[in-house]
From Swiss-Prot:
Annotated PROSITE patterns: ABC_TRANSPORTER_1 (PS00211), ABC_TRANSPORTER_2 (PS50893), CYSA (PS51237)
Lineage: Bacteria, Pseudomonadati, Pseudomonadota, Alphaproteobacteria, Hyphomicrobiales
Gene label: cysA
UniProt similarity note: Belongs to the ABC transporter superfamily. Sulfate/tungstate importer (TC 3.A.1.6) family.
Binding site for ATP: 35-42
Annotated protein name in UniProt: Sulfate/thiosulfate import ATP-binding protein CysA
Amino acid sequence: MTIEVRNLVKKFGSFAALDGVNLKVDNGELLALLGPSGSGKTTLLRIIAGLDWPDSGEVSFNGEDALAQGARERHVGFVFQHYALFRHMTVFENVAFGLRVQPRAVRKEEARIRARVKELLDLVQLDWLADRYPSQLSGGQRQRIALARALAIEPRILLLDEPFGALDAKVRKELRKWLRSLHHEINVTSIFVTHDQEEALEVANRVVVMDKGRIEQIGSPEDVYESPATAFVHGFIGESIELPVRIDDGVVRLGERPLRLAADGLAPGASRLFVRRHDMLVGPPGTGAFEGAVRHVRNFGPVQRAEVALFGGETIEIDAPRDRELRAGDRVGLEPRRYRIFAG
């Protein structure tokens, strides 16, 4: 099932939740909508599901107008952050629910329903919990059951709204790998919403980065991380250093200090320099584009996170290998291995 969104606009009063969004999701794709709160990602998901309606624009499934259909007719499976399981039903009954409430004309006979539920519980590797109630399950188990229930009706599209947001970090990491593997098995066109960049980069085939109701960039996880298209994407994905610089006569300046950085093709005026923390290489004073003094050092597993006061007035944090053995008071030269400069 392919999904296409064209010029989608949705406002809540004067607030534009979606501002001219265009997007195509390919058949069998696992796509992540990534962005901060208020970026429009959940609003977009709800409109695709038929749970909300745009002020203008088009949504099509395989070329057919989806906005002419209600939520039931769209045949979409939806997984919420907080499971939405029925507490008074067993795991088996929860998964069977969607099949048992289908219109009589399309409802399967009970034996086929039971076979389908067993198949799904095997798929999510929780067949041994069929007779348990939601209160007897862990958070990760509940979310797997919620996903099995969404798949029971054999949806054309699977939508997931912050599916792992209510789980602890260890369980979230386990379920990311599981979801990627499961999607490979079921091959259903799927979209999931998240504000967790690590989750989006690890799970999705493509990532859509959103901010303020607009799409900032669409690309593979590698593309959006290695080649951010805008200052917002660079600042939102990964841990970046951001410095206010100016381009004057082909020279990059931090305050009044010229930096030995290429400025070819950059327009003169105020700009922003972005460098990943781990891309700032540490050397002796005088050896890099920047110089500064180490103020404070903290150890994080294999790296040191050092706070460095630059000779130019700015203070930054860098990540260096532990064997570099930085100490407070050290004077250092810093050379960005990779960097991007954006106007504005």
